[in-house]
Amino acid sequence: VGQNTGIRSRSVLSQTGSYKGIERMRQPLSRELSNLLERGRDRQLRLAVTGLSQAGKTAFLTSLVNQLRHAGVEAQLDLLPAAREGRLLGAQRLNQPDLGVPRFPYDPGMAALRDTPPRWPEPTRGISELRLQLRYRPARSGWLTPEIAHLTLDLFDYPGEWLLDLPLLQHDFYSWSQAQALHEGEQRRGLFSEWLTAVEQLDPAGEADEAQLAALAEEYAQGLRRAKKAGFSDLQPGRFLLPGELEGAPVLQFFPLPQLDASQHNTSRETLEALPANSLYATLAARFRYYQQQVVKPFYRDHFRRFDRQIVLVDVLGALNAGPERFEDLSSALRQLMHSFDYGQRSLLTRLFAPRIDRLAIAATKADHVTPD
């Protein structure tokens, strides 16, 4: 946040220990912007930012937008060569092309940082977008290079909980139930203890009871919310934490069956998949498939696969301070996320017809809490 905000941004940001973490994170982002500013063909960049477990993504985006808007005046963009050399002339907000996506709350975020005492911006609870047009002087001049060039920067903010849903596409209900580590780790087991006791008494072959399903799904969602508050990251399904317009819908009334054991005949995959449609197992499996097809895939298709670049902010220090169980949980979440990204340089055909993420940055915030020794 630049000096023009009316507050001393360095002291404000360092109060919670994230300023230097964001400062260090700006280096790879600055290199990326620098490369784009010097390229002759790419004039648009779609950058998505998300974070795990309150890593500070909304504050980061608010600060980034403010710095770019005041480039050449009071911004602190020393890691961006175009700004350091005086060639970045500034940025202005433009109307976003997709009117169906909420605008990123930049102004409320700045108002929070200017408040007395300063406050962190409110976290967003859905996807939002903000479009900037950057004006700059190219480093090299020529008869094909204009004196003043422009880069359109589309910034997207979306909840990390939604990102954690993408690994669900690799599972069916049976394998997802087995993958849930609800029995592992004393702290996590304690957060789901009552739900585990109740769900382990269920008969997967028994007839589904809608009232019972709704009650157990809500109890499972409460366990996820407790786990999020305790700092856990590997939490699925993500929409149970931020249901939005789906709150109360049957699509969110399912849960894993951690008691499934392929070595036992009565809970083997073959036995359970042969059960009638009104059985508990078949009902939960059907809702899991619906969630994959109607909730997760549309987000992946309509938004995620159109991003060019992705930044994932992670509070590694918080996980380290919380002990081995929390740290392993964060590691597990990151391992799963790696399978959700498409890699590779963008060819012309790819850029025109199938945009995808070809650059991913995973950044640890709160780096200033780590001493030099």
What are these regions (language model features)?
Residues R43-R46:
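Pre-Walker A (Motif I) flank of P-loop NTPase domains
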Residues S14-E38:
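N-terminal pre-Walker A segment at the start of P-loop NTPase domains
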Residues L29-L36, G40-R41, Q67-R356:
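Switch- and interface-adjacent substructures of P-loop NTPase systems
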Residues H369-D373:
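GTPase G-domain guanine-specificity segment
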Residues V49:
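Hydrophobic anchor at the beta1->P-loop junction of P-loop NTPases
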Residues F60-L61:
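Post-Walker A alpha-helix
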